[in-house]
Amino acid sequence: MEQVKKIVLSNGVRIVLERIPYVRSASVGLWIEVGSRNEVASENGLSHFIEHMFFKGTRTKNAFQLSNEMNFIGGNVNAFTTQENICLSAKVVDEHLSRAIDLLAEIYLESLFDEEEIQRERNVVLEEVKMYNDTPDELVVDSFMGHLFADHPLGRPILGPPSNIEKFTRDDIRAYLQREFAPDRLVVSIAGNFDLRRVEPQLRRVFEPIKPNGWERNPITHPTASYSSYNEDRNLEQVHFCMGTDGPKRTSADRIAFGVMDTILGGGTSSRIFQEVREKRGLAYSIGSFDMSFKDSGCFVITGGASPSSIQEVVGLCLDEVRRLYTEDVTEEDVESARQQIKSAVLLGMENSASRMSRLAEYEIYFGEYMPVDKVIAELNAVTRNDVRQMAEKYLKGRPVTYASIGPASSFRPFAGSLSF
């Protein structure tokens, strides 16, 4: 039974804690409910840029001293940015948890955003963009998102365009922080071996003084999906493609049944797409499906890579497998296999304090309350063959498809028109 406690400070900061007494690690994360979807077009990339700058010096430590402190406490100190969140995290031996909390708090609350460091890190981020642009199997997902959620922040790349990154200033950073970063958007999550009698007072001391800023935030708008086909012409050995449609939001009651359907279709080596395209026909090395979900929307994606000569056949096979989901009943064996895959991922994640810390934070951010693992497993076990077919009929049957690819222009001709599931 998980030992979870939630504390809401007077300024709106939420703290979620799970004590795991039988481990020697502790993981702490500062989750800020701000990401690329909070940005206007001219700010695109600023959330990710700020994430980088958090590690470049505070009032008492320069970047090198911060690195030394991270090395001293050992473990892993990390950060990432998504469409909806920025996370600063550390996984350490339990005896160093107090120092890890203070370190992350100092990074979050006292970063200087020095002009010289901004210029230096600007070059680092521009190199990151170049690296990403040289990775077509990842870049094509951004292209897909940009066309599915056209003219909406969810369709913009998290890293942002170079033209924005080259212009970001200290004033831009400060204005964005004042507008979007507020205590009621901060979730502090800790999982591992710790003494609540020591940790809770420390967290109150560090985070209770944060004052609401009172600034008007950029309004969050609901995305509307659009459907089109697009290819970026590159002289590559493979065509990297991504196709899909909009799907359930993060809090949808359909999320677990939809996950079972997705796993049957393209989640792993036993999935229908993988077996049909790779194992039976040898037409691709990488092929599969996944879903992404946000607070108010989501999307379902099939992605892979194939030779220009076989891309039309591969895409056709994927479409056939999608249509089978709503024209034929899946077997009980299919459903049970998918259940076991998802169940294993959930339960194995419970062996890791960092995974449990992330799970705590994500449930707080998206649901406002924690869902015990037993309840998740019970909902998973309740998914039936009929539920899977209903998900396919509700979210996929006849739905228009957005198709994006990166590869030779000649490979795109069969997909220049409209596609549908």
Regions found by a protein language model. Name each.
Residues 2-4, 8, 19, 63-215, ...:
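Charge-rich, well-structured scaffold segments of protease-associated domains
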